Amino acid sequence: MMKEIKTEFKNNTIAIDFDGVIHQYSRGFQGLDNAYDPPMPGAIPSLQKLKDAGYRLIIVSSRPVKPIRKWLEKYSLSHFFDDVTNIKQPAKYYIDDHAIRFDKTDPNAWHKTIDFIEEGGDK
């Protein structure tokens, strides 16, 4: 069972990547206008939980906005998102399948980041 989530900060935006996070993206890139898979397992109840907690959800993707909006309509998910953009927005959190966590308080953060990449990351 998922724990209750509470928003406590002024910036209550969560920026979410599209391919591989919301859209399953099982066959990789098939063209900018081709979003071919259904939603990722667990995405819909998780999006609902975030909305219920008062978060503003936006999709930030390198894919053009129009095919994402079309896909959201196809799967009746448009109501979850306050915006769809291909420009990075200020957000409290970013959910992305290719992100590397960077701890700005760690003086060795860059060293650890390079080590992670050189070791093959999450393979």
Residue ranges and their predicted role:
Residues M1-K123:
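HAD-like aspartate-dependent phosphatase fold
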